[in-house]
Design a protein with these regions (language model features):
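N-terminal alpha-helical modules
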Residues: 4, 18-116
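Sec-dependent N-terminal signal peptides
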Residues: 4-15
Length: 116
């Protein structure tokens, strides 16, 4: 997973480098990218919840709470080796964005399966 995150970091670093010139700018862009991914997740989650029966809602709500704990803990773990460095927020935010996008894909699959 570390290799994947480092690969993603360097990929996004070089893409971001065209517009962001400083570490602060890269961190700000990563924050905006994560917020965008989180917004898409919340939109998909709300749509899915609205279509579920009471029992399914309870199960999804608990699953989402558990997933949030996992996401936050995992990304803190991935960013920890960079403690004290200005790159740490970028590593953390990139991890949050990628895991959030993956969760959104899973929720969209559930939504698609529900609509079939």
């Amino acid at each position: 997973m570390k290799k994947l995150l480092l690969s993603l970091f360097f990929f996004f670093f070089f893409i971001s480098a065209a517009t962001a010139q400083t570490q602060l700018e890269m961190n700000e862009k990563a924050s905006l990218d994560y917020k965008k991914a989180d917004g898409e997740l919340n939109k998909t989650y709300k749509k899915l919840v609205s279509l579920l029966d009471k029992n399914e809602k309870v199960l999804l709500i608990q699953a989402q709470k558990d997933w949030i704990k996992y996401r936050d803990s995992h990304c803190k773990f991935e960013a920890d080796p960079y403690t004290g460095g200005s790159i740490k927020p970028l590593i953390l935010l990139t991890c949050l964005e990628e895991i959030t996008k993956e969760r959104t894909k899973h929720l969209k699959e559930s939504l698609k399966n529900l609509n079939q």
